Each structure stands twice: as C-alpha cells, then as structure tokens.
Amino acid sequence: YELLAFNERDLANLVSRTVIDNLDLVLSNDEHRQLNTLLLHAPDGRLRLRNLMPNFQPHYDLVVIDTQGARSVLLEMALLASQQAVSPVTPEILAARELRRGTLQLVEDITPYRKLGIEPPALQLLINRVPAVSSNARLIQQTLRLIFQEQASIQVLATEIPAIEAFPRAATRGLPVHRVEHRRPSGRQALAALEIVRGLANELCPQWQERFAAVTGKAGGRFAHVERP
C-alpha cells in the first residue's frame, strides 16, 4: 500500500525476504482494498507503478507482478508497468469467450498510451489445466492457436500446463511445484512438473536457459517461508 499510495522507495520498508537467496516478495497489505479507488482518482494512477519500477531495477533481474484476473485500475497499472504479460486461459469455451471480452479488450483499450511513448506489453497466453483426454479441450486449444497465429502482439505459448495433481499439492504444501515433482510418475503421459515449469521458463526468459537447465528440483524440502522486514 505504501509503495503505491505514498511513493515509498525504501526497499527495506517494502521487501520481505524469503529463505531462497535473492528471491524477495512485496506483499499486498491493502486489506481494505482502498488502492483501486485511490488510483482511479489519481492523475497518474495508471502510470504510478511504471514510474516506480526504476527503483527496483538495480537490485533485481526480474520483477514478477501477480494480479487478479478481474479488470480494474490495478490490472491496467500492472500492464502499463510491464514488458511482458502472461494470461492463463483454460481450454473451455466460456473461458475463451471471457478472454475475448476481458483481457483482449483491456489490451486494446490501453493502446492509446502509445501516444505518450508507452508501448503496451505483448500478451502471451498460457493454456492452463489441460485435461489428459478431452476432444473439446483439444479443439479449443487448436482454435486459440489458429486465431492468434498472425497477431504479432499476442502469442499462444507452446508450453501447456496439464491438469495434474502436482500443482494443487504444491500449493497446499507451500512449495514450488518443481520441488514437489521432479520425476514423471510411472504410467503418466504428461511431463514431470519440473520439466513443464522449465519449459515455460525457457519460453518466457530464453536468456537464462542454461541456469534453468541446472535446476534439479532436489533442493531441501523446506516449506516456503517469508521473513517480514
């Protein structure tokens, strides 16, 4: 809240450390959900985070902004502050329609910021929770790829996230999924969670492929922990 409401720039007051070296978090403390209203009425509301990002750049190679999917001024602000945007979509007809009405419309609505020299990020669609066997899901996947194959500003990622039990299990345990499942279970067609996440990381950040290849998922199985400042 302090970052966006008061332009707080001291990282010691913003960042929470984790047990993983160089992996820090900025946790939301907007319990009363006041930021949406504040930013909506602020003259620089949608550009505030973009103007604050240089404060993080000397300290981090990558900043990931996790937002809610529902359209809001916070989501618009996050998009305008980003160089890449990843939107998950399930292979279901209702989700595909909502993608069209919501996310794609939002991307189109922020294009006028180009007149201010702000280039909206390219949108990358991640097909999520893909069932092992479903002709309908396969058809929707193929349709999504066909629709966007000639749109330079929208890419459907080659990596797909299958509907395997490892992902909810990892969330329940508070662990990265690649530490929960680094080998493919016998008899399952889908890749191991480690290989899936590595493939996604390689697509999103190809400059770090060698580092991703060195990740084995066999690190000590400690639960995720956040140390607040």
Protein language model annotation of sequence segments:
Residues 1-229:
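P-loop NTP-binding core
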